[in-house]
């Protein structure tokens, strides 16, 4: 059982698309494997977060900056996992299905959990000099999620799954850029 769990993590990190094609990976234990991966990545995510807070407290001269509690990180991670899965289900299955798309919410929930495996690599970020490398596992996670969504929703090309997965990030980036330009164009008196 533990060997199967490690195999899922390694295959997800290797971006193996057969991980998502094999129905035995979506059996009874799949939801537990996905939940463990999600919780593991949430707890590991505290490492770069605490390093960032230490750096920022040194920059701004404040020694009293505390990060979120482990409980709030776990609860937030589970809520974000459910919301992201609901978004992917609604957009991928309800709005833009392919002709052969037959997928349920649980399968997408497990896929999002499996695709989170590259975020385990954040455990190697133990110094402020390595903090910039935390974007590599996040990009890796998005690529893994694109592959997983493409396989379980049976899309013909990766373009559709890429747009579906990256649309919230693109919209957030565009909002950020628009706010940046709005702040520069206003006059402060």
Residue map of PLM features:
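Juxtamembrane boundary at the C-terminal end of a transmembrane helix
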Residues: 173-189
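Transmembrane helix-loop junctions in multi-pass membrane proteins
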Residues: 47-56, 120-131, 181
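Hydrophobic alpha-helical transmembrane segments and adjacent short intramembrane/lumenal linkers
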Residues: 89-177
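Short alpha-helical linear motifs
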Residues: 57-61, 129-135, 184-189
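Juxtamembrane transmembrane-helix termini
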Residues: 51-55, 96, 147-154, 182-186
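Selected alpha-helical membrane-embedding segments in polytopic membrane proteins
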Residues: 1-103
């Amino acid at each position: 059982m533990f060997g199967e769990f490690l195999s899922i993590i390694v295959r997800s990190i290797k971006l193996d698309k057969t991980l998502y094609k094999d129905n035995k990976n979506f059996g009874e234990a799949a939801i537990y494997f996905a939940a463990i991966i999600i919780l593991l990545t949430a707890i590991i995510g505290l490492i770069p977060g605490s390093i960032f807070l230490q750096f920022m407290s040194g920059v701004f001269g404040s020694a009293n900056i505390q990060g979120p509690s482990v409980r709030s990180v776990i609860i937030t991670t589970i809520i974000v996992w459910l919301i992201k899965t609901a978004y992917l289900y609604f957009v991928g299955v309800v709005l833009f299905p392919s002709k052969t798309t037959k997928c349920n919410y649980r399968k997408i929930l497990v896929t999002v959990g499996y695709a989170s495996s590259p975020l385990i690599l954040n455990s190697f970020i133990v110094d402020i000099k390595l903090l910039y490398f935390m974007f590599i596992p996040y990009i890796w996670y998005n690529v893994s999620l694109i592959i997983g969504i493409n396989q379980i929703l049976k899309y013909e090309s990766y373009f559709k799954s890429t747009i579906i997965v990256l649309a919230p990030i693109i919209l957030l980036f565009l909002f950020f850029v628009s706010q940046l330009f709005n702040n520069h164009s206003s006059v402060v008196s």
